[in-house]
Amino acid sequence: MSDQNALTPRVLIVRHGETEWSKSGRSTSFTEVDLTAAGAAQVSSAAAVLVGSGKLIDPCKVAHVFVSPRKRAETTLDLLLPPSSDISKEKITFTEDITEWNYGDYEGKTSEEIRRLREDKGWDKEQEWTVWSDGCEGGE
């Protein structure tokens, strides 16, 4: 049996296409930022390769889709799985449970700007700040 016909359930995670903020390195969580034209093209290109009968994402075999309620994620869904793909609205759940983490006070700032802010507060003298080890002031 080919992998495409396997009975094992699959979970696929798709990130939204490029936004102006992701393009410029700005931290984005709760702010509504639309896809750029390039971001929309990224998703459309991925859809052409990944979505369709016999492809990795076969709309007839999709059991459920979970989507962040951010506009960029909704637009990505619409480009990846358009209404013509026959996925019923009942199979789509918009949920805050899969939103990007909260950047708090660092929302909209670049890593360089965040490091400067933290330096001004006298923080990170031992090692340079990273979002992974030090988190976000006022966020996660």
Named regions from a protein language model:
Residues 3-87:
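Active-site-proximal alpha-helix that buttresses catalytic centers in soluble enzyme cores
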Residues 83-140:
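Phosphate-handling substructures
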